[in-house]
C-alpha cells in the first residue's frame, strides 16, 4: 500500500485556514494555493534520490550531493489543479508539465475525460498529480488510470483537502500511489462536496460561478 500523509506543518495549516474562509477573494485564494503547493512539494520530494558528484569549489575539489534518478513531471487535473502548478515549479523549476482534463457530471458525480497532453518521456518521470480536492476519488482514479495506460508508473497524488472515502477509493484503485494532503476533512455532503472543505476550488481560483 502506498503512503498516506497529512502534511501538518504550521505554515501550511495557517494558509489553509486563510483559503477556507468564504470571504477570501480570488487574488488571495490563488496566491495562497500556490504557496501551500510549494510548501507541500518540499515534503513530497523528500525521498528523491541523491548521488555523489565531485565539484570544484573556490577552496578546491569536494564531493557533494546532487539529485539523481527520475526527473519530475507535474500533472494537474484540469481545471483546478492548474492552481497548484506554479508553486511546485518555484521549488522544482526544471519539471515538465502535462495536463489531464476531466469534468464531473453534476448528477452522477462521475468524471469524464476530455483532454490529455503529456510530456513524451512520461514513462521515465516521477509524476506529481495535483488537484486541490480529493472528494469521491473518481477524478484522481481516472486521471491515474489514463497516465498508467500511457506508461507512467511512478506516481504521487497531491491535494490540499481530502476525505476518508476519497482516500480509501484511491488506495483501493491504485495501491502503489502515495497520497499527500494538507488536511483530512470530515465527510462529503449530499452534493459530493467536501465538508468543511474549500467550496468549489476551481471557481474560487478563477473567479467563476
From Swiss-Prot:
Name assigned to this protein: Uracil phosphoribosyltransferase
UniProt source species: Enterococcus faecalis (strain ATCC 700802 / V583)
Residue numbers binding uracil: 194, 199-201
Superkingdom of this protein's organism: Bacteria
One Pfam assignment: UPRTase
UniProt lineage: Bacteria, Bacillati, Bacillota, Bacilli, Lactobacillales
Ligand binding (5-phospho-alpha-D-ribose 1-diphosphate): 79, 104, 131-139, 200
Cofactor dependency: Mg(2+)
Family affiliation: Belongs to the UPRTase family.
Amino acid at each position: 500500500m502506498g503512503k498516506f500523509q497529512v502534511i501538518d506543518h504550521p505554515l501550511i495549516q495557517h494558509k489553509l485556514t486563510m483559503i477556507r474562509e468564504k470571504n477570501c477573494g480570488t487574488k488571495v485564494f490563488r496566491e495562497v494555493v500556490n504557496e501551500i503547493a510549494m510548501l507541500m512539494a518540499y515534503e513530497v520530494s523528500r525521498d528523491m534520490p541523491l548521488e555523489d558528484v565531485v565539484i570544484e569549489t573556490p577552496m578546491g575539489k569536494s564531493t557533494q550531493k546532487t539529485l539523481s534518478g527520475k526527473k519530475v513531471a507535474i500533472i494537474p487535473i484540469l481545471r483546478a489543479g492548474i492552481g497548484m502548478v506554479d508553486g511546485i515549479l518555484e521549488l522544482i523549476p526544471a519539471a515538465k508539465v502535462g495536463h489531464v482534463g476531466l469534468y464531473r457530471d453534476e448528477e452522477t458525480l462521475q468524471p469524464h475525460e476530455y483532454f490529455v497532453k503529456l510530456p513524451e518521456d512520461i514513462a521515465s518521470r516521477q509524476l506529481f498529480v495535483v488537484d486541490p480536492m480529493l472528494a469521491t476519488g473518481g477524478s484522481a482514479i481516472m486521471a491515474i488510470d489514463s497516465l498508467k495506460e500511457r506508461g507512467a508508473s511512478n506516481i504521487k497524488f497531491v491535494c490540499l483537502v481530502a476525505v476518508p472515502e476519497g482516500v480509501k477509493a484511491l488506495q483501493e484503485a491504485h495501491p502503489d500511489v502515495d497520497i499527500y494532503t494538507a488536511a483530512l476533512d470530515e465527510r462529503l455532503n449530499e452534493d459530493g462536496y467536501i465538508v468543511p472543505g474549500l467550496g468549489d476550488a476551481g471557481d474560487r481560483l478563477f473567479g467563476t460561478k
